[in-house]
């Protein structure tokens, strides 16, 4: 089933495969390579894959035909999946992710808020199982850079247990409980 996102108007494709992973196509670009004999037409696809429990992977694929480019991107996304620790369908703390000129601000939200994020970020949060989050793109709006910045920020998230271990304290001292 294909649907159009509200913010960018680009087509996203949402599928759940037999292995339980959700796939979303973020963008497909038509690219050309100029050679002596003329132009060679091709396509570049950007996709994300998630397990709905905090696992997320991003891939890009290039080919002369759209389905091959999308398949290559999906395969790359499956191979490069990372695990993000979530708490009740949201993040542990606010974070800023950066990649190139793109900056992404992400903040945990209370139950019932939903996914308040634009374009490629919304696709990432949907496939990885985040249900409540506030997010904002700052700087570049290039989908590839936004996806990389979002993954950079998500990768930097630390759980209270990680912070407690680093500081040599108990989790109760960190959380204030």
From Swiss-Prot:
Q: Which UniProt keywords apply?
A: Ribonucleoprotein, Ribosomal protein, RNA-binding, rRNA-binding
The keyword RNA-binding belongs to this UniProt entry's keyword annotation: yes
Q: Which GO terms describe its molecular function?
A: rRNA binding; structural constituent of ribosome
Report the residue ranges that make up the S5 DRBM domain in this protein: 21-84
A GO cellular component entry from the record: small ribosomal subunit
KW Ribosomal protein (keyword) present: yes
Q: Which InterPro entries match?
A: Ribosomal_Su5_D2-typ_SF, Ribosomal_uS5, Ribosomal_uS5_bac-type, Ribosomal_uS5_C, Ribosomal_uS5_N, Ribosomal_uS5_N_CS, Ribsml_uS5_D2-typ_fold_subgr
**Mind telling me which PANTHER family this protein's record contains?**
MITOCHONDRIAL RIBOSOMAL PROTEIN S5 (PTHR48277:SF1)
- Family classification: Belongs to the universal ribosomal protein uS5 family.
What is the role of the protein in this entry? With S4 and S12 plays an important role in translational accuracy.
Q: What is known of its domains?
A: The N-terminal domain interacts with the head of the 30S subunit; the C-terminal domain interacts with the body and contacts protein S4. The interaction surface between S4 and S5 is involved in control of translational fidelity.
Q: What is this protein called?
A: Small ribosomal subunit protein uS5
Source organism of this protein record: Nitrosomonas eutropha (strain DSM 101675 / C91 / Nm57)
Gene from which the chain derives: rpsE
């Amino acid at each position: 089933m294909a649907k159009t996102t509200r913010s960018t108007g680009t087509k996203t494709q949402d599928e759940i495969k037999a292995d339980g992973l959700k796939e979303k196509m973020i963008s497909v670009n038509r690219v050309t390579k100029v050679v002596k004999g003329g132009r060679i037409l091709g396509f570049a696809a950007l996709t994300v894959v998630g397990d709905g429990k905090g696992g997320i992977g991003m891939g890009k694929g290039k080919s002369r035909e759209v389905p091959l480019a999308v398949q290559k991107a999906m395969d790359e996304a499956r191979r490069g999946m990372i695990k993000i620790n979530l708490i009740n369908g949201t993040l542990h703390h606010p974070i800023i992710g950066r990649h190139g000129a793109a900056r992404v601000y992400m903040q945990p939200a209370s139950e019932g808020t939903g996914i308040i994020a634009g374009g490629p970020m919304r696709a990432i949060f949907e496939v990885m199982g985040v249900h409540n989050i506030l997010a904002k793109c700052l700087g570049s709006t290039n989908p590839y850079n936004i996806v990389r910045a979002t993954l950079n920020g998500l990768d930097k998230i630390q759980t209270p247990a990680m912070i407690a271990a680093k500081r040599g304290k108990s989790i109760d001292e960190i959380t204030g409980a």
